[in-house]
Amino acid sequence: MVAVIIKGNEVAEKKRAQLKEKVVKLKEQGIVPGLAVILVGEDPASRSYVKGKEKGCEQVGIYSELIELPETITEERLLVEIDRLNGDDRINGILVQLPLPKHIEEKAIIERISPEKDVDGFHPISVGRMMTGQDTFLPCTPHGILELVKETNLDISGKHVVVIGRSNIVGKPVGQLFLNENATVTYCHSKTRNIKELSKLADILIVAVGRPKMVTADYIKEGAVVIDVGVNRLETGKLCGDVDFDNVLDVAGYITPVPKGVGPMTITMLLHNTVESAKRAGVVCQ
C-alpha cells in the first residue's frame, strides 16, 4: 500500500475559490469583509507570515489593513490600538501576529480583542464556545486539519484520533474539534510513557511537536490517516515535518506532506473566519 497524499495546497485553493464567490455576493449587498493584522517588531518569520495573509486577502477580495508597530511599543499603547479596531466597522477580523516582545503579555492582548472579531479563535470565549460545541470562530490550524481529514471522505464518528502534542494553538483544540465530531480522542505529550504503542492504535494520527521526523513507520497503524503539522528546517536548509514522510508512506492510508500540507489551510481558515464575521456583522460599507 502506498498512501494517498493529501495535497493541502490544492484543497486550500479550492476553498479560496469558494470564498471568493462568497465575497462577491457580500459586496453586491454592500458588505466588504475586512481584516486587520497587527505586526509588532521586525521578526522576519512573522513578517513572512503576514505577507502570506495579505496575499490571501487580496486573492479572495478581502480588504486588509496592516498595522506595523515598533518592538518598543508599550502594552498599554497596543491595547489602545486594539480598542480602536474593535470599534471600526470596516474591520471584521483582528489578528495580532505572535510571538510578541517579552514585555507584552500575550494573554492580555488576546483577551482584549472582541470575540466577534476573534478570527484566530484564541479568545477564551471562543475557546469555551468550541469546547461546548457552540457556533464560534474555530482556531485556524485545527480547523484546517479537520477539513483535510474530511477530504478523505472518512467517517470520523467513532474513529480513534491520537494527537501527539498539547499546545494551546494546535494540540489541545484539534482534539476537541474531533471530539465534537464524535471521535474518541487520545492526547500524547512529552510525559506520555508509551507514545509509540498509543499512536499505533490511531485511525487518525495528528502530530504537532516540532521534532524533525520523530514519527516513523512503527508508530503507524496500517491504513491510518496521518496529519503532519510540524515544520522544521534541517541543516541542509530543506523543510521537513514531524513525520518521516518517506518511511511512513508505505504504511499510512493518507498522509499530508511538508510543505504544501497543513500550512496553506491555516491562512485559508483565517480568511473563512473573516468572511463569516462580515456576514454576521452585516454592516454596509459607505
Swiss-Prot record:
Coiled coil: none
InterPro entries reported for this sequence: Aminoacid_DH-like_N_sf, NAD(P)-bd_dom_sf, THF_DH/CycHdrlase, THF_DH/CycHdrlase_cat_dom, THF_DH/CycHdrlase_CS, THF_DH/CycHdrlase_NAD-bd_dom
GO biological process: L-histidine biosynthetic process; methionine biosynthetic process; purine nucleotide biosynthetic process; tetrahydrofolate interconversion
Binding site for NADP(+): G165, R166, S167, S190, V231
A Pfam family per the record: THF_DHG_CYH_C
GO molecular function ontology, one term from the record: methylenetetrahydrofolate dehydrogenase (NADP+) activity
Pathway per the UniProt entry: One-carbon metabolism; tetrahydrofolate interconversion
Cross-referenced Gene3D superfamilies: Leucine Dehydrogenase, chain A, domain 1 (3.40.50.10860), NAD(P)-binding Rossmann-like Domain (3.40.50.720)
Keyword DNA-binding set for record: no
Domain of life from the UniProt record: Bacteria
CC per GO annotation: cytosol
Keyword terms, alphabetized: Amino-acid biosynthesis, Histidine biosynthesis, Hydrolase, Methionine biosynthesis, Multifunctional enzyme, NADP, One-carbon metabolism, Oxidoreductase, Purine biosynthesis
Catalytic activity: (6R)-5,10-methylene-5,6,7,8-tetrahydrofolate + NADP(+) = (6R)-5,10-methenyltetrahydrofolate + NADPH; (6R)-5,10-methenyltetrahydrofolate + H2O = (6R)-10-formyltetrahydrofolate + H(+)
NADP is among the record's keywords: yes
Assigned EC number: 1.5.1.5, 3.5.4.9
Disulfide bonds: none
NCBIfam families listed in its UniProt record: PRK10792.1, PRK14186.1
PANTHER family (UniProt xref): C-1-TETRAHYDROFOLATE SYNTHASE, CYTOPLASMIC (PTHR48099:SF5), C-1-TETRAHYDROFOLATE SYNTHASE, CYTOPLASMIC-RELATED (PTHR48099)
Matches recorded under HAMAP family: THF_DHG_CYH
Oligomeric form and interacting partners: Homodimer.
Family: Belongs to the tetrahydrofolate dehydrogenase/cyclohydrolase family.
Function, in words: Catalyzes the oxidation of 5,10-methylenetetrahydrofolate to 5,10-methenyltetrahydrofolate and then the hydrolysis of 5,10-methenyltetrahydrofolate to 10-formyltetrahydrofolate.
Protein name: Bifunctional protein FolD
Organism expressing this protein natively: Bacillus mycoides (strain KBAB4) (Bacillus weihenstephanensis)
Lineage, top ranks: Bacteria, Bacillati, Bacillota, Bacilli, Bacillales
